[in-house]
Amino acid sequence: MAAYLNRTISMVTGQTGPADDDRHASSTDTVDKSGPGSPLSRFNSSLQQSGSTMAANLLPESRLYQSNDKSPLQIFVRAKKKINDIYGEIEEYVHETTTFINALHAEAEIVDKAERELFESYVYKVAAIREVLQRDHMKVAFFGRTSNGKSSVINAMLREKILPSGIGHTTNCFCQVEGSNGGEAYLMTEGSEEKLNVVNIKQLANALCQEKLCESSLVRIFWPRERCSLLRDDVVFVDSPGVDVSANLDDWIDNHCLNADVFVLVLNAESTMTRAEKQFFHTVSQKLSKPNIFILNNRWDASANEPECQESVKSQHTERCIDFLTKELKVSNEKEAAERVFFVSARETLQARIEEAKGNPPHMGAIAEGFQIRYFEFQDFERKFEECISQSAVKTKFQQHSSRGKSVSGDMKSMLDNIYERITIFRNLKQDQKNLLTERIQGTETQMMQVTREMKMKIHNMVEEVEEKVSKALNEEIWRLGVLIDEFNMPFHPERLVLNIYKKELNAHVESGLGSNLRARLSMALAMNVESAQTEMTDRMHALVPNEQLLATSTKMVVRTQPFEMLYSLNCQNLCADFQEDLEFKFSWGIAAMIQRFTGKVRERSKKGQPALVNRQSSIGHSVSTPTTTPVEATPVCLLPAPVVAGITPEQLSLISRFAVSSIGSQGTVGGLVVAGVMLKTIGWRVLVGVGALYGCIYLYERLSWTNSAKERTFKSQYVRHATKKLKMIVDLTSANCSHQVQQELSSTFARLCRTVDTATTDMNDELKTLDSQLNILEANQKQLKLLRNKANYIQNELDIFEHNYISPQ
């Protein structure tokens, strides 16, 4: 076996002559002395187990010429196609079911909002899974700190220096390397379809260049598939900026890592794992379920300078990496973690493969001693990487999607079963509802006729009561009109312009006062009576329509923003517009005043005696009139006998009085002298002078007392008589108007309630008509639910077959 190992090493180094046997033996001794935990010891153990197959895999040229048909990655390709087909059926099924559930929710409240949202969430969930499954490749993402050699590792696996690498921060954006069908390499920037020469990657992705891209931007590099077997099998490499460059790790993961199948953490073997590197993969493990992670301790060639502490450092790094994968991330067990930690030199491997491409032996690219071990370790990483993809990718990726597909179909089937049961119950409820509606409509029509008769009678009685109360209250207020007018305190002046304003304000005062007094006496009681009647109407109508929605509608129509208020339209401005005051001074004991006072009494007697006179004229007797009981001496000034006066009309009597007064006024001087002469001869001059002096004093007193106050009192007295006469004329009209307002209020309320009941009855009739159609729809829904349940069973059977063919044999 030692000879086999020496021969394999010689094939790698290019030295096969016997002169190098000592060197080969020295190399073998180095392998033996490296200890059981070293990479070469692990490689030696693997060699002894796998024999010549392992030796063939160690040859760098062998993987370049592997047949694509025999690649283990083809299992993944076939499985991916099958699971994509199944998920296409699942997506169609989920869309069909969700559309049906949404329509069912709109037609009848069988499905609640939470269930409907859950069905809709399956649409997005399946679409997200399909988006991952429909990729044409597997993605491998490389992460690590700045200048740890991520780009160098990808270049070594691609066997050419494609990505920028070197000292310092080299990769400033995400670079995605994927296979192209053509023989030329090109690149495309994010948001552009222009194909650029791959040489320009140094100008687009290098941080040292003036024209640099954003850290989260993506540059896609298309490399010929035939130049790398991994690209030929649709594997994509993603190079990233250093995790310590930007704090936007969540954006990086969301934009570039959610669909990654394998993550490679590239560490610097000269230092320990940093918090930034750990934090990034902690975030990845939170967003992805158990990601596949490989850890490469790069730049291990630096350990050749300190061979005495090489093993202790390696053991320390290995232990920390295993603890990170098992205890912190919990993505693998210790055995799997130990198989995913490697110590390599990417730069050295890249140089060796470049020399190999030139036809030179690989060892010409060696940087330090121990090249063979590091080179074998890198080959071991590539082999384990392919095995992980071919053996684990299908299981870790598709098994989860298969289980989720079963879970989706199973959950939907269970929910559909529950909905089917609820529809059955709902159908029974609909049938019972139909029977209840029929009975309710018949009872409503009968009770509606009875309530209408009772409410009409109640409105009629209330209207009569209101008319009587308003008439009585208004008459009482008219009787107290003098008190109301005395309360008016506006300054009075007999000037015509001022007097017109005074009358206008007095009319407004009377109208306001009467209205206020009537409202104080009647409005509260009337409003309470009206509200009580409306409440009774509403309660009676609500008893006819117990539906909550109709009750709310009728209540909204009846409720007023303000209580009912009676409007008393007196309109004193127009009513007393014909009032004409008489503010001229009149001596109360003057001849004209005496005549007017006498004629006034005569008018009163004539008004009282006029009906008797009419009766006497209409009686059969007509011949002789009965003598008057009033003696002639009671009216010495009147020149006509009482029977004649009793037969004179008021218009004729007024004309006679005016003529007498005017005659006396025109002949006052002569008449006065005649009367004075007669009285002088009859009673003597002393008595006449005394009476004249007394008469003059009385006249002078009344004349001096005729002030604005006296004029105002006279004006108000005249206004009271005039307003009382006018207001009594509208008592019946006002009371009728108020009763009409009450009638309108109650009638409109009852009419609205009747319309509400009629609407409810119409709705119930319409509901009866729609119940049969709803029952037919429910039957159709039950048939559709059965069909959807059968489709769910079919999908579960398809997933069982997929697991048996692709997941169980693995």
Curated annotation (Swiss-Prot):
Basic and acidic residues bias locations: 20-32
Region span, G5 motif: 327
Region (G2 motif): 170-171
Maturation and modification: Ubiquitinated by park and Mul1. Ubiquitinated, probably by HUWE1, when dietary stearate (C18:0) levels are low; ubiquitination inhibits mitochondrial fusion.
Positions that bind GTP: 147-152, 298-301, 345
Known tissue expression: Widely expressed in embryos, accumulating in the mesoderm and endoderm during gut development. In the male germ line, it is expressed in spermatogonia, spermatocytes and early spermatids.
Side of membrane Mitochondrial intermembrane, spans: 649-668
Catalytic reaction annotation: GTP + H2O = GDP + phosphate + H(+)
Keyword Mitochondrion: yes
Pfam families linked: Dynamin_N, Fzo_mitofusin
Coiled-coil intervals: 427-476, 759-806
UniProt keyword list: Coiled coil, GTP-binding, Hydrolase, Membrane, Mitochondrion, Mitochondrion outer membrane, Nucleotide-binding, Phosphoprotein, Transmembrane, Transmembrane helix, Ubl conjugation
Matching SUPFAM superfamilies: Fzo-like conserved region (SSF111479), P-loop containing nucleoside triphosphate hydrolases (SSF52540)
GO CC aspect terms: axon cytoplasm; mitochondrial envelope; mitochondrial outer membrane
Stretches for region Disordered: 13-40, 609-630
Modified-residue entries (Phosphoserine), positions: 38, 554
Phenotype of the disrupted gene, per the record: Lethal at the early larval stage (L1/L2); mitochondria are fragmented and mitochondrial respiration is impaired. RNAi-mediated knockdown is also lethal. RNAi-mediated knockdown in specific tissues such as cardiomyocytes, muscles and larval neurons produces various phenotypes resulting from adherent, dysfunctional mitochondria. Mitochondria display characteristics such as abnormal cristae, fragmentation, elongation, decreased DNA content, increased ROS and depolarization.
Span of domain Dynamin-type G: 134-382
Membrane topology: Multi-pass membrane protein
Ligase recorded as keyword: no
Modification Phosphothreonine occurs at: 8, 553, 555
Protein name: Transmembrane GTPase Marf
Species this protein is from: Drosophila melanogaster
Taxonomic path: Eukaryota, Metazoa, Ecdysozoa, Arthropoda, Hexapoda
Gene: Marf
